[in-house]
UniProtKB/Swiss-Prot annotation:
<feature type="transmembrane region" description="Helical">
    <location>
        <begin position="1219"/>
        <end position="1241"/>
    </location>
</feature>
<dbReference type="GO" id="GO:0042773">
    <property type="term" value="P:ATP synthesis coupled electron transport"/>
</dbReference>
<feature type="transmembrane region" description="Helical">
    <location>
        <begin position="1073"/>
        <end position="1095"/>
    </location>
</feature>
<feature type="transmembrane region" description="Helical">
    <location>
        <begin position="1172"/>
        <end position="1194"/>
    </location>
</feature>
<keyword id="KW-0830">Ubiquinone</keyword>
<feature type="transmembrane region" description="Helical">
    <location>
        <begin position="390"/>
        <end position="412"/>
    </location>
</feature>
<feature type="transmembrane region" description="Helical">
    <location>
        <begin position="1296"/>
        <end position="1318"/>
    </location>
</feature>
<keyword id="KW-0377">Hydrogenosome</keyword>
<feature type="transmembrane region" description="Helical">
    <location>
        <begin position="718"/>
        <end position="740"/>
    </location>
</feature>
<feature type="transmembrane region" description="Helical">
    <location>
        <begin position="966"/>
        <end position="988"/>
    </location>
</feature>
<protein>
    <recommendedName>
        <fullName>NADH-ubiquinone oxidoreductase chain 5</fullName>
        <ecNumber>7.1.1.2</ecNumber>
    </recommendedName>
</protein>
<keyword id="KW-0472">Membrane</keyword>
<feature type="transmembrane region" description="Helical">
    <location>
        <begin position="1639"/>
        <end position="1661"/>
    </location>
</feature>
<feature type="transmembrane region" description="Helical">
    <location>
        <begin position="565"/>
        <end position="587"/>
    </location>
</feature>
<feature type="transmembrane region" description="Helical">
    <location>
        <begin position="1418"/>
        <end position="1440"/>
    </location>
</feature>
<feature type="transmembrane region" description="Helical">
    <location>
        <begin position="98"/>
        <end position="120"/>
    </location>
</feature>
<feature type="transmembrane region" description="Helical">
    <location>
        <begin position="358"/>
        <end position="380"/>
    </location>
</feature>
Amino acid sequence: MTKIVMLDYIPMLNNGGHRHPADIKPSMINSLLDSMSIILTSLCTFCEQLSLNEAIIVNLGINTLDQLLMSQAGRYLLLYYCIYALELYTVCYSTLSLILLYLIQLNYILLTNIVGYLQYSCSEIANLVYTYILLEGLLDVSELDALVVETLLDYLWVPCDLIIRYYRAYWYFEGVYFNLNIPYVQRSAYWLCVVIWNNIGWWTYQLMIIGWYSLSCLCIRLVPTILAIINLILTYIDLIIYLYDIYSNYSNMTWLGILYSTINSIIRYDISRIHAYQHLLTVIIPNYCLAIYNSGLILSSLLLDIYHYQIGLTILALQYLVAPLYISCSLLIYILCYIMTELLYSRSFYIDLLLRLLEIIYLDILVNSLISIIILILSVDVAYLIQLQVIILSQYINIISGYVAMPTTILITWYLYNIAVYIYYLVDYIATISTLIIWLLERILWVYGICANNIEPVVIDLPQLTLTSLDALLNQLLSEWCLLDAIMNVVTSVILLITVSCLGVLRIILFIAVYPVYCIGVLLLNTLLQVVVGLISYIIGTFMNAIILICDIYVYSIHRPFLPLIMYVYFVAAIILEPIIDIIHTIILAEHALFNTYCYIIFDILQPLHLQAFEFYRDLIWLIADLILAYIDLIRSTLVEGIISFIKWRLEQDFQLVYDICEFYLDEVKPRIIRYWNIYSRWVRFLIYCAGNNINLLVLLYVQFKGYTLPMIILFDLTRIQLYATIPVIISSYIYQGILQTMLIISYYNTLLVATLEFIQIWLTILSVSPEMLYTSTLGILLRSYYLLYEILLLEPTWVLFECLSTCVGLVELYLVTVETTVSNILIIDLILMEVLLEDIRQVATILTCILDWYILETCLDMQYADILLLMSSGLQSTVLNTIFDLLSLLGLLDETSIRFILELTVQVCTIPAALYSTIIYPYIVLVTRCLLYLPDVVQLYLTIGEYLLRETLYQLLIDWASCKLYSYNLYLLELYNIYYFWLSLLEKYWTFTYHIYNYTTLVELSPDLLISLISYIIDICILSLELLLEDIRWGSTIFVNLLDWYLLDTQLNIQYIDILLITSYSVQNTLLTVVFYILNLCGILNEISIQILFEITVQICTILATIYCTVVLPYILIILEILSYLPEIVQLYLDIGEHLLLEILWQLLIDLLYYRAYDYILIAQLLCKVTYLLYIVLEQLLLVIIDLYIYIIGDLLIIGSCHVGNHIIDILCSAENVYFLYFMIFIGYLLCGIFAFFYHGYLGTRGIFYLSEMIIMGILIFSIVTLYYNLKYHLALDIILGELALSNEVIFTNIITFDILSILGVLLVATLTAIILTFGVEYMLREAFAYNVLATLVLFSASIICFIVSYSFGLMIIFWEISGTLSLFLIDMYYARIRTTQAVTRTFALNRFGDLWMFTASIEIYSLCHNDALPTLFALLPYAQFNLSILGNLIFDFTIPTVIVFSIFSAAACKCAQFLLFVWLPDAMEAPTPASALIHSSTLVVMGIFMILRFAPILHLSVYTLYIMSILGSLTVAYGAILATQTSDLKKAVAYSTISQIGYLFTGCAFLAFRATLIYLILHAICKALLFVLVGYIVHMFGGTTSLRRMGGIYYIVPDIAIYMFILCMVLAGAPYTVGFFAKELIVTTLTNTSSPVATFIICCWIISFACTPFYLYRICVLPLFGRPRCSRRVFRNIVSPQSTYNFIDSDSSLNSLLHKFTNLITRWSVQGRFTNLLHLLLLLIVLFCGEFLVFLVTGLFGTSTTLFSDTAIDDSVYQLTDYYLLSYYRVRNIQLLIIVLFALVTLYITAINNQLTFNIIYLSVVLPILAIIFICLGHYFLVDFTVYIYNISNSLIFELLCDLAIC
């Protein structure tokens, strides 16, 4: 009955696959349950019958396993039970599969019953399978019939039949399946392994599907149902784990175990039965070993399949969230990988284990007969596994080799070179000192010998040499020698006396101690060098010999898959040699001068590579090869029976010699290799550690080495690549010699191995003929010798190889993870981009189709739209297709899916130009869709489409040309060129495409005939295109002739038509010739037909051109010549007619026509030269035409040559690059001017310094504006690298300057302020004695600031930082005679040095991190440098390197900008002259300090603590500066404290990263503060030098213009409503109010304090001196200013001033009465109190009264928009603001018009207002604000109209 059930359900599974749960009915489940009960009953019956049969077997007398195996009945009985068990297993499996598929539709009761059945049945089935495995392992089925085995295998048929069929096909292919000599035990066990594993995989898959659907469908059911399903899942997981344990137990019985059990069963018999096993040894055992080998191969492939299958299974398990199953699969993968690793790495262990087992048996005969075969089988098996692994590792082997060796090679070489250099200098220094001491001693001895009246020097006691003896020596010399000798000896004695008295006994002791040490050191150095050289020579020789042995054994063995692995081993050996050779080369370079004699010893290091060891092994190999070849020849030439005794005698002698040599190698050489290899392995591990820690700084470098491309990853700076590039050149000669010797040895080994194999084959033949040869001792010696050879040549290289692989495994894992992640991300992104691109192209195609429909319906062809469509189609076609092909070629995605995808894209792209000629859209799409699967058809399709498009395009071109569309012809012809280029490039890309397809798959192949037909087809298309072009040009010639006839009939000389003809003719001939030559060069079809066509085309083109030239251009040129011949008359005519006609006639004639045609003539001449060179042999008529044309062209060029050159020079000078170059040269000139004026100011004088500086500053301003225009228009930022200075390996000083928007704005600001202050300084200090000194210092000071601004390296910034700081000290110390000045300079110096200390701290950190000071390098590396600097064990702070650098820069800027607690020096700076104070306050503080923070803006966010400190410090400075300004009564110090307070705003803005707002307020504050200082200087000067506010007043009555200027400046600085200061400061306040940090409250409190104090000190600064009553004496007030004074700004004698004088007298009367003064003071106090910051806070909504003025959600960081709900409307705010500016300008113009002394007004009008306008316009352009809109709105405003009416009245 079970048989019937099986036949019912098995076909349903095999044929139908998995049934849908809805197809299964409850009746089928009931029958399945009945079948389950029958199965369980049969199972019990089987167990009972098994027990009965065991009893029957015992009764038959079969007590042992051997008896059961030897019994035929027992074998058939066991086979019957196995078949029955498998039948039950198959039925149970089918039943369980159906039950699992029906689980989703079951209810709770049925589900619980099924769970119980499944638990019982699964355990029973597992027991059955395990029983079968045990029984099958005991069977010997080799003698059974093959049909019985086939029946047994048929019962193992499972739902995974596809895998079984695959393996059957594989066995059939290998010729093993029908070999009856193969033991079926192994095959049956193998099939059972496959069946069990496939069942596990299928069950797992079903389990995941069922679990997923069960959880999703039953999640809304009752909890017991879900628990039952979970119980079912856990039960099946237990079943899988149980079956895996069974599989593991079975897999432990490896083929070695089976062989070992077989040998054990054989050797249990007596030795007397050995003869009975001769047949077994000669026939069965070799076949058995062959079966073991084949089974091992299949098992290896099975393990790999299991490995890959489990990877997919693991991913699927993760997707279905089955955690226990995932753990089981992961464990299984780990165990399988471990098994493969053991098989890969434990070959020597298996061999040793087998040898030990065989040594226990004491059967020499069996050992001598089987050992070589077993070793061969094991090596082949493991070799196959290694081959599988090498396929994976071969792609990364070369990278790993460079990865390991190269980084530390360079590092060690560099350090050794430095050490050698230092030793050289040390030795040189010691030698110099020793030489000096020796010379002194010799001199002493010589003098003392003369003193003793001895000619030869005598040995004396050195301590006896005293001053007394020297005096005696001097006296004796004077008495005995002549005067000259006496004088020389006196000089010598004096030198000796000075030397002895200064150095004394120490130098003598030094000489006595150093000289012997020096001699001993040189001796030791020579000895040590010789020892090291000998040791290195021995190590290299030994190791290279070992590597060569590895190459010999593996490269030319029968296992060729080892070749990539052996090349890797050889490259490792070459890399090992490189460090040693680098060390030698470095020593040679460093010590060449002192140790030249040692070079020969060093070069002898590589001698063992080709002299000693090679000769020894070569002789040894030739000896063995000669012996074996002699034996082979002897065996081949004589009879086997007659030479057996001779062979025995020779073998005993010769192989004993080989055996002794091998034993000597094992005893002597092998320990040395092991010791040297241990040293090398430690070295390699260190290299891996170094490379692993620096993985982020690796650079990929390709080095071509002897035909092999070796990618090596090196670890060193890019600047050292040039140093290392010489290393391969040095070592190439030595490596090449090693390669030659290695190839020679490999050839020797090849001969040896071939002879050995032939010898073994013949020897096996001998053994099969004469089995008694097994018992001789000669064969035992032979086999032991081979065993030793295998141990030497096979095992040791394997050990070395796996040591290398084990050391590189860490790098392989790291590299694979990185590459895998990167490639996967790139593939995902590119696929998404391609999908988006396809959708985009579809939309564009739809849009263009609509446009074309509209275009076709139009009655008149509008050329503009046609050009647009052509350009769009051409651009899309070329760009999109090239991008797609490049992406697919790079990523290797050229499979079936990508072919379909790219064809779809091509259809979409090519539909656009095809729609222009609406006849081929439908055929094209049909053809494309027809050829989606075959590549040759696709290529043919594109060629067909190309021809069709070409014909249609040319036809359309002829129609358009016939319509006289001359301009469009050029575009159409370029479109033709693009189409040609597109199809040719497309064909080239398809060649590449075909190559990739041919490499990766074998589905598509291009036959040679097809390729030839494709090429011929291309040539036909090109010839056809040339014919069409010729026809096209003939049409064009006719049209041109008609046009020229029409032109000649015209009476007027129309320049426009001439331009049309010239441009068209040039475009036609240039484009056509380019297309023709390009096509001919690409296709190579310069045959007779193409030359004829080309000639006709050229004749037509040149005829057109010559006709146009002769009929149009030549008369035009003759007219020009005639005009030029009457040049004097023309000049007189120009004087009469005027400048307008001059520009309209002569300039337009020469420049607009001839200049633009000259370059065209040159190109025409070049093209015609090419044509002439090709055709001058055949065609003489064309030569005449070309010669005539040349005559006209040369005449034309002679006329316009000078004009062309001049305009070309102007264009060169006006280009952007030259603007930047001239800009840089002006900077250098200004710096040199400052240096010259500072050191040689006496040659120039005050006026010379002033005029020279002002001229250069004007140039700087002009070029700054031009450069700013280029930067804003083209978004440029030019960086100029002036060179590098390597102070050491770790410190590289880089000279970089930059011209970006920030630096140019800074230069504009500083230059403007310098010009203002220099003009003011000349007038202010005209009567000072040291005025030139002040001006020279100011010029150099501003030059250093400008250089600081444009510097883009930290080293340059430090240099100019120090220069400017030093010059500021010079400026402060001008009145050095004053005590207060000296004290001020001291305090300023101390605080500046404190800031410089922080700058040097930042430089140390930057050089230690980046090794150079370039700011781009710092900005790139600093975000990734998170190295902690712990202070007090992290109890206080935990700083990082970016925090230290940012804090140091902030601290330096805080010192320079006089922040809180660091502002003491700023009031002291008021001791300087007023011009110096103005420049210091406006430039040094504002520009340098804040500019440095803005320059380092990209890294400020890396230190949050620094930003908090900066915001707190800036807020304290704001409040404290304002408080101090209210308390001081000194005018200059009040302005200084106001500067401190205002800079606090800038610091706070930088702390909140509002850099754009900070930059705007920086420029505004600098200009206003500089002008304020100028006005304060005038006021102080007018009051006789007093600065006390208590002694000032009434300035408005005397000089009202100064009062107006100062009042406006104070309002701007205070932030009066609708002024620039109001909006600039509001940007910073808005940033603060939008911040929710805990520091914001404290900052707001500080700012409120400042806002409260600001009106008071501005009131005191502005109102008291200007509008207050005069507080000085009448004499002083009377003598302040006279109308004729230099500093009077109003001329009282002017008639225009009467109204102003009346108004002044009125004010004076009111002032005397006191009414107007009080009212004016009250009004100004109210304005100052309620202006500025309070109104800003009010508008921004901080006090809850209104909304913010600017939008919080702006489009950009720098673009603020106004909305409708604000307090004031947008245009009203802007109009009122600009109205104030216009009123201010009108007042200035009025004052200028009525003033005689225009000094200050000229400054303001010529410098300040233009610069302010330019800066605001540039900033508006930068912030996307259009000021023309505001001007337009002002012109339309009612207030402006009213003002104009008043002005007219």
